[in-house]
Amino acid sequence: MIEVFLFGIVLGLIPITLAGLFVTAYLQYRRGDQLDF
């Protein structure tokens, strides 16, 4: 049961990590875009 629980945690963390990276890259892109203006 512990292995299934850990597997569920990993499956839950992967999308959150990808979303965090995407948001960070998007904010940096907008920040650079504002600096161009």
UniProtKB/Swiss-Prot annotation:
The keyword Chloroplast applies. GO terms for biological process: cytochrome complex assembly; photosynthesis. The chain crosses the membrane at residues 5-25. It is a single-pass membrane protein. GO terms for cellular component: chloroplast thylakoid membrane; cytochrome b6f complex. One of its GO terms (molecular function) is electron transporter, transferring electrons within cytochrome b6/f complex of photosystem II activity. The keyword Transmembrane helix applies. It is found in: Plastid, Chloroplast thylakoid membrane. It comes from the Eukaryota. This is Cytochrome b6-f complex subunit 5.
